[in-house]
């Protein structure tokens, strides 16, 4: 399954995920840590260990270096 991952304020990527892939897998695929982001589906946060069931997500970075 291909999923569009939009990192808010940054870039949007297409990520291939296995049928049993989780939202944490998506986050790692765009070189982020699941501990520094929240994944949003239809504007609502989802658990990182939940299986991916949609084809588009937004990723909100909670920690940003500076």
UniProtKB/Swiss-Prot annotation:
Keywords: Isopeptide bond, Nucleotide-binding, Phosphoprotein, Ubl conjugation, Ubl conjugation pathway. The C-terminal glycine is likely acyl-adenylated (-COAMP) by UbaA, and also probably thiocarboxylated (-COSH) to function in sulfur transfer. There is a cross-link at residue 66 (Glycyl lysine isopeptide (Gly-Lys) (interchain with K-? in acceptor proteins)). One of its GO terms (biological process) is protein modification by small protein conjugation. Transmembrane segments: none annotated. There is a cross-link at residue 58 (Glycyl lysine isopeptide (Lys-Gly) (interchain with G-Cter in SAMP2)). Changing residue 58 to R: Loss of isopeptide linkage of polymeric chains on NcsA. The modification 1-thioglycine is found at residue 66. Gene3D superfamilies: 4.10.410.50. Disruption phenotype: Cells lacking this gene grow similarly to wild-type in the presence of either DMSO or oxygen as the terminal electron acceptor, but are retarded in aerobic growth at 50 degrees Celsius. The lysine tRNAs of the mutant strain appear to be nonthiolated. It holds the Pfam family SAMP2. InterPro entries: Mopterin_synth/thiamin_S_b, SAM_domain_containing, SAMP2, SAMP2_halobacteria. The modification Glycyl adenylate is found at residue 66. One of its GO terms (molecular function) is protein tag activity. Monomer. Monomeric and polymeric forms interact with NcsA. NCBIfam families: SAMP2. Functions as a protein modifier covalently attached to lysine residues of substrate proteins, as well as a sulfur carrier in tRNA thiolation. The protein modification process is termed sampylation and involves the formation of an isopeptide bond between the SAMP2 C-terminal glycine carboxylate and the epsilon-amino group of lysine residues on target proteins. Is able to form polymeric chains with itself at Lys-58, similar to ubiquitin and other ubiquitin-like proteins. May serve as a proteolytic signal in the cell to target proteins for degradation by proteasomes. This is Small archaeal modifier protein 2. It comes from Haloferax volcanii (strain ATCC 29605 / DSM 3757 / JCM 8879 / NBRC 14742 / NCIMB 2012 / VKM B-1768 / DS2) (Halobacterium volcanii).
